[in-house]
Amino acid sequence: MAGTLIISLDFELFWGMLDVCPLEKYQDHVLGGRKAIPELLALFQKYGIHATWATVGFLFARSAQEAASFFPEEALRPTYDDPALNSYAEFSKIGETDAPCFFAPSLIDLVAGTPGQEIGSHTFSHYYCKEKGQTAAQFAADMAAAKAIAAKHGHTLTSAVLPRNQCDPAYIRVLRDLGFTAYRGMEDNWVENKVHVHFPLRVLRLTDTYFPITGYGSYTPKQEDGIWNLRGTQMFRPIFKPLKFMEGLKVHRIKRQMLHAAKNGLTFHLWWHPHN
């Protein structure tokens, strides 16, 4: 039995960084990600690579007004204990010149028009399933909105990636009930399967990028409660400048993981963000 390579990209622009840093500090990364997408698509076409682009629902909109027309009713929007996580509140702050960091309908069309590329979901609002204060009902409303705005633009969503890989069984059942057939589950190792990450764990994650402290990570996919868990194996992390001289080790590690999956008929799931 041949091994399987899965590639997924978290297509989110600035929506995934709202609680991390101000736009002006990250804008160049986001705009660089926009420029990288056509180049990635050209490479994918050249080498016959199929990929799933897990897309934040807000990106389908051509304006804040269009996005707002798909908002769930107020009671069904996320009530996070930490208000910085609530991307619905961000729309009043988006200026005309900021739009390329928040909306991307033309890029979605470009991806969808490229052979072998699937438009998946990264939730409507970059929703956090394990943060305190929100509920499964609010998540269901958010995902229904994601499906609705995608459908308006001609896309049927069947694959999902939950932001920051915050997977919860009750929320996965919501995905199944909404017609999703697969999701990217959390990596099955002691370094990655944590929701909140402290500094020592970040160091271990970085180390695992270059050295196999968590092993190969390949697996046989399983269908659980009627939906396929295609869990991640390795994030293709961006270049860390102080360790740039070790990039060869990072690539070598990924190649070894891919080879192990190929030789043993297993699945290897590589993922990243376009702005990486």
Where are these regions (language model features)?
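Catalytic alpha-helical scaffold of carbohydrate-active enzymes acting on polysaccharides/glycoconjugates
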Residues: 1-159, 164-230, 246-272
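Positively charged, amphipathic and often flexible ligand-engagement surfaces
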Residues: 233-236
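Short, intrinsically disordered, charge-balanced linker/junction segments flanking boundaries
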Residues: 274-276
